[in-house]
Amino acid sequence: MAADIINGMEIRESILEELRGEVANLKRDYNVVPGLVTILVGNHPASLSYVTLKIKTAIELGFHEIQDNQSETITEEELIGIIKKYNEDPLIHGILVQLPLPSHINEGKVLHAIDPNKDVDGFHPMNLGRLVIGGNAITFLPCTPAGIQELLIRSSVETLGAEVVVIGRSNIVGRPISIMLTQKGVGGDATVTLVHTKSKNIVRHCQQADIVIAAVGVPNFVKAEWIKPGATVIDVGVNRIGFNEDTGKPILSGDVDFVNVSQVAGKITPVPGGVGPMTIAMLMRNTVRSAFFHLSL
């Protein structure tokens, strides 16, 4: 029996509808419009595509949106200077620097330069530290892990007491979602095993899991025989495996062998249309929350 498809586009739309109401309340009650700046260095096609989607969504929600495109030759010092300018701009509540950056720029230094209270991507060390502490300490959740957790919650996937395997230990997805799923509350209280390329017995771990989250960056890495019947499978991978000359678009594959795994799993996310749309929705939610937060500063 084929798995139920977790439709990230539909869940994204319901979240954006909720945010439209919050944006309207901000405007009506406080005359405040959420402000988001997206900083793009160079013209990397994938980065340009991602930024365009983010800008489009922000405009649809009624944000004050600034697109700041910079040449690939910009220096690290100049880029940090631009960030500091937006740190001090009261009309800007969220600062997004699109990664990757050119090799001559230290990404860590750039991300550290963002005001933690405007770090709507949730990558600043201070916000990652708040995530570890949990509870009321949390300011902004990293967008992709937050999107994964929201998919689980809104798809009625029980995490309380669940055995979860996260494949991948990146600071962007694997580590944060592992922490979030072990915290107390809705979408948490799980028992999490984090595995990676150096782990032994990855297959055995996955076969015991109620939920498998694949964020390893290898096309079709997770096989059907790895999955316990009825388990939930979340595919974070977006891998370009070819190019469709008829449509002019890249051919994408996730980290999961979708065709075969979907015959075993109970629920599964597709690629595209699963986790990806949720990442942008969580960025928008963080920006709205930042606008509310700045009312008290």
Swiss-Prot record:
InterPro entries: Aminoacid_DH-like_N_sf (IPR046346), NAD(P)-bd_dom_sf (IPR036291), THF_DH/CycHdrlase (IPR000672), THF_DH/CycHdrlase_cat_dom (IPR020630), THF_DH/CycHdrlase_CS (IPR020867), THF_DH/CycHdrlase_NAD-bd_dom (IPR020631)
GO biological process, one term: methionine biosynthetic process
The EC number(s) this enzyme carries: 1.5.1.5, 3.5.4.9
Catalytic activity entry: (6R)-5,10-methylene-5,6,7,8-tetrahydrofolate + NADP(+) = (6R)-5,10-methenyltetrahydrofolate + NADPH; (6R)-5,10-methenyltetrahydrofolate + H2O = (6R)-10-formyltetrahydrofolate + H(+)
Keyword Hydrolase (UniProt): yes
SUPFAM superfamilies given in the database record: Aminoacid dehydrogenase-like, N-terminal domain, NAD(P)-binding Rossmann-fold domains
GO cellular component: cytosol
Functional pathway: One-carbon metabolism; tetrahydrofolate interconversion
Residues the entry annotates as binding NADP(+): 168-170, 197, 238
UniProtKB keywords: Amino-acid biosynthesis, Histidine biosynthesis, Hydrolase, Methionine biosynthesis, Multifunctional enzyme, NADP, One-carbon metabolism, Oxidoreductase, Purine biosynthesis
Gene3D superfamilies xref list: Leucine Dehydrogenase, chain A, domain 1, NAD(P)-binding Rossmann-like Domain
GO MF annotation list: methenyltetrahydrofolate cyclohydrolase activity; methylenetetrahydrofolate dehydrogenase (NADP+) activity
Keyword Transmembrane among UniProt keywords: no
HAMAP family associated with the record: THF_DHG_CYH
Family under the similarity heading: Belongs to the tetrahydrofolate dehydrogenase/cyclohydrolase family.
Subunit structure: Homodimer.
Protein's job: Catalyzes the oxidation of 5,10-methylenetetrahydrofolate to 5,10-methenyltetrahydrofolate and then the hydrolysis of 5,10-methenyltetrahydrofolate to 10-formyltetrahydrofolate.
Protein name from the UniProt record: Bifunctional protein FolD
Species of origin: Lawsonia intracellularis (strain PHE/MN1-00)
